[in-house]
A protein has these predicted regions:
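Polyanionic, low-complexity intrinsically disordered segments
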Residues: 2-31, 133-136, 151-214
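Short, Lys/Arg-rich flexible segments
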Residues: 25-38, 42-45
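Short, functional N-terminal and low-complexity linear motifs
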Residues: 35, 83, 112-114, 163-170
Length: 214
């Protein structure tokens, strides 16, 4: 089990890799790249964009769990501030057992579960209640992940509802990749970059908790 600093370093590196993958995919398709007689087409680009997003979401999920356990073990944030905890595990394995209880695992893709556990284990939920400040983006990202992971009517409907709520209409045959490459209304930032910046914001906020107020 690494430190909070280790978790931040690893997560930031993976965010940059995901962004690089998407940028390179777009560059290849716009340049009509070929290799061994195979032309790099939009379909290939879309697959890489979607893989880049999945990598981003997996990075966030892993980071949330790692930092949660670090604070359970009494580690202070990068800014030197401590999080007052209600548990005192002896090591990371013990922390995982306390955290999971009778469950096989804790769903670190669920904002409500994370914040509920945080309020049970830390004073005022520690820094994890920051997730409520980015609730829409967090829920969006999970719905997009579900669309990529599950072939179901529910995941498709949730994705289409997300698209409508974000850009006010549903493009014909909209895909996850095409949505992620769409700019936010009246902005020059794509949804992929927006969600990446949200992820980076979460990484920094959780690693730098506020001074605890009893």
């Amino acid at each position: 089990m690494g430190t909070i600093n280790d978790a931040v370093t690893e997560a930031m590196a993976k965010c940059n890799l995901a962004l690089g993958l998407v940028a390179e995919a777009n560059a290849l398709v716009s340049g009509n790249a070929t290799g061994n007689g195979i032309v790099f087409i939009q379909h290939h680009c879309d697959l890489l964009i979607e893989r880049g997003f999945m990598s981003l979401f997996e990075t966030l999920e892993s980071y949330l769990e790692s930092v949660f356990i670090c604070y359970m073990l009494g580690e202070v944030g990068i800014n030197g501030n401590a999080v007052i905890r209600y548990v005192n595990p002896i090591n990371s394995e013990h922390a995982e057992k306390i955290l999971c209880g009778k469950e096989k695992y804790i769903d670190f893709t669920s904002r409500s579960i994370i914040t509920t556990y945080a309020e049970n284990f830390f004073l005022h939920g520690g820094p994890f209640l920051y997730l409520n400040n980015v609730s829409q983006d967090f829920e969006d990202m999970k719905k997009i992940r579900n669309k990529l992971s599950h072939i179901s009517i529910k995941s498709q409907r949730e994705f289409e509802s997300l698209v409508r709520s974000r850009i006010s209409y549903l493009p014909t045959n909209v895909s996850v990749a095409s949505f992620l490459m769409t700019n936010l209304p009246r902005q020059t930032e794509s949804f992929f970059v927006h969600y990446m910046n949200t992820t980076i914001g979460i990484i920094n906020a959780l690693a730098n908790p506020a001074v605890p107020v009893p």
